[in-house]
Amino acid sequence: MDAVSLQLILGRASGLRYGQLRSALESISSRPIDIFAVEALLGKRSDTLQSLGLGPAASAWLQAPDAATLAADRYWIARNRIQLLDAFDPRYPPLLTHVRDAPALLYVRGDIESLSLPQLAIVGSRAATLQARLTAMQFAAELSHHGLTITSGLALGIDAAGHEGALRAGGRTVAVLGSGLDRIYPAQHGLLAARIAARGAIISEFPRGTVPLRNHFPQRNRLMSGLSLGTLVVEAADKSGSLITAQFALDQGREVFAIPGSIHNPLTRGCHALIRSGAKLVESTRDIIEEIANSLPKQDDMSRNSSPKRVTRRLATLDKGHKILLDALGFDPTSVDALVERTGFPSESVASMLLILELQGTVGSEAGGRYVRLPDERPG
């Protein structure tokens, strides 16, 4: 049987973990443990497979894989350029090999090599405030300039802002799904997902046709933290799913960072709880870089105390919308709400444009979520 067929069989073995699989193979196979060793499990009685430590669902499937389902899966991966990454492959993310319940197979759309680059997970509330989304975008952009790939879950709010910040800064980003790669969730992020695949990867441990069920998201979260050197929580209520990701990170021996907020905002209580429990309080990207600097790629003229490089462009290169926003901003500190009122632009558009202008060095941010236009640089 060829490698792709065996990989597709693994992908349909519900709940199968790499550790379980390897242990079972070592019990019955004398050949080297690789993807081809999996064939030794096929057709064995379900109770025999369970006695080797595999779960009931995985055992039942391995006893009698459905040929029609596998044929449809093979057609799907070929048509949609889906890559299969089994845990025996040397390209399997090295940090995931240290996660106790790492999946036996990942479905990947995009660049597999992105999964082995240094990553930082950015997570937070789906119903995040505009200021928190701006913060997530800014942190993602600046961390990208330090060589970090930004990993998140494609959800509304902070997840999307983290992906967007990395993309707008020309960086890499990875989205981990709680569904099959054919079921982008939420559906409105279809275009964002395509952009992520072009600048990184979208991955899932779930096979084609898997819908985004509630219990899938903790599984997704443990992959996000498992791929990453650390997890940054930008804004989270006291029962946010982001806290699950943070707990996975702690259990996996990874760093946890949290951005504090107003004591009057219920969406910051989760971050404050993390800080009280030992997470590092973060006020700038420098606070993160100094903790993980030894794991980052070396870059010329960059030290752990340096500020992220900014993309500097002349005002003449800005489009009409950005110029309107700059004119509305002026040189006095101004809130996002005021800019929305002055320009008539949607708040999301203002947020995105402010991020670009800040990366270009034409806008600066101040305390309280206010922005100010910076003097245009002139030669000499």
Protein language model regions, located:
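Glycine-biased, small-residue-rich flexible motifs in mid-sequence functional cores and linkers
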Residues: M1-V4, G15, N80, L84-G380
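Short, small/acidic-rich helices and loops at N termini and domain boundaries
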Residues: M1-R91, V336, Q360-G380
